[in-house]
Amino acid sequence: MIVLVINSGSSSLKYQLFDMRKEALLAKGLVERIGLSGSMLTHRPIGKDQVVIETEILNHDRAIQLTVEALTHEDHGVVASMREIDAVGHRVAHGGDTFSDSAVVNEQSLANIRALFEVAPLHNPPAVMGIEACQHMLPGVPQVAVFDTAFHQTIPGYAYNYALPYELAAKHSLRRYGFHGTSHKYVAQWAAAMLGRPLEDLRIITCHLGNGASITAIDRGRSVDTSMGFTPLEGLIMGTRVGDMDPAAVPFLMEKEGLTTGQINDLMNKKSGVLGVSGVSSDFRDLEEEAAKGNERCQLALDMFAYRVKKYIGAYAAVMNGVDAIVFTAGLGENSPSMRQSVCSGLSYLGVQLDEEKNKGRGEADISAAGATCRVMVVPTNEELMIARDTYRLLKG
């Protein structure tokens, strides 16, 4: 089965094409600035030269059309025709409590995704545009929606409910949903394989640390708690998101600074986090570089980030009555030995002990010292492959 994976944003569209017989990546690409000036497609076929096509791309229909044309081109294509594309898998951010698993796209599932626009106004509408564009450009090709929230639907009620008036919270579906579920699920499965143990026997804490960051407690294969909440704003300090904060600070700031609801939302989502603390950047590489030069605010931002991660690890170890493995993934988790060291220092009571030399390496690795009872691992995430796997799983029958 040849599966096209689509991650559709409001003005961009990422794609990857997989041959699921071997789980082989055939090509990947990015369509940028949809509906804006300077739009382009960057196509990267495996084993061939990269191709950049600069052209007017008014909407997602045109973006998908260009994607299919690139994949089937006689020079830089990787399949002979669009008829070879057997299925399309879409990343959809929010499945609410409607979807506890990925779902084949049909009239009902599409209506249910649209019904969640109110709780995911930035992410779900572009996903639907991508789905509809594929329906237009690849008629008859089955599609699957894979939800960032679905993996977390196993979280128990005492962990996902907020202590608001019960009827009010239920009326507005106001609860913890969690995100990055596809990534957390993938790296947990891979870590179990690396350890040579069944996932169902393990207590794993997965740390997806990038510009967006979240932590999940996975008890014997099931998500039992996660740091992001009703939206991706809750939990860890992030590149530009504030993370956990006293909610009373919101009306206080609105009153003192004369901010609207939109402005305070923008402040907490786009101007806070390590960017807000450092005043320098949301990119952790920049912060590490500046901190090494003596920038105290950059160091403070890094220390605050590491402390929050460590605090969640301790909490989730308590939730699961221990932990067998801690997994680092995503941009910062995979590529920053110093951040992994900062997070893991002081966790010896959990059986955590890093091997300093292994921690300096790159790529997939068990970076624990010999004899450590809690394994610390680095696993590069691959959300696109996980989406392709779910698409294949639901359609192969």
Curated annotation (Swiss-Prot):
It is found in: Cytoplasm. The keyword Iron does not apply. It comes from Heliobacterium modesticaldum (strain ATCC 51547 / Ice1). This is Acetate kinase. Mg(2+) binds at N7, E383. ATP binds at K14, H208, L209, G210, N211, G212, D283, F284, R285, G331, L332, G333, E334, N335. The keyword tRNA-binding does not apply. Its main location: cytoplasm.
